[in-house]
Amino acid sequence: MIWRAGAIALVRRSKTVGQLRLLFVESWARGLGIGARLVSECVGQARHVGYRRMILFTVAGLDSARRLYEAEGFRLTEEKAGHAWGKDHLAQTWELEL
């Protein structure tokens, strides 16, 4: 059951833009394709409700997540230095045209 292994959210940003948020897969379930399935289902739902574009915000260094986003067709559109949770990081914006 996917809901016990991970989670993802699709948030409305505007009438035409949805935001992928909060992708999480339990450590014991990583590497089983669950993250890819969650991202794919989220993109499918965005298309179903009529969004024309999706965005997501993340930080550099989350390579497993980045590979999932790239495989689904997201492209990196912006990077900028930031500071959160007591650490410096490189904030990233990714976008997908639907």
Model segments located where?
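Conserved GNAT acetyl-CoA-binding A-motif
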Residues: 39, 45-58
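Short coil/turn segments at alpha/beta junctions that flank glycine-rich nucleotide-binding fingerprints
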Residues: 16, 32, 48-52
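Residues forming the Rossmann-fold NAD(P)(H) cofactor-binding site
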Residues: 32, 36, 40
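C-terminal "cap" of GNAT-fold acetyltransferases
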Residues: 52-98
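Conserved amphipathic alpha-helical interaction elements at protein-protein interfaces in regulatory
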Residues: 31, 44-48, 75
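Acetyl-CoA-dependent GNAT
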Residues: 1-27, 39-41, 45, 78-82, ...
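Active-site acidic-Proline motif in GNAT/NAT acetyltransferases
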Residues: 26-28, 32, 60-61
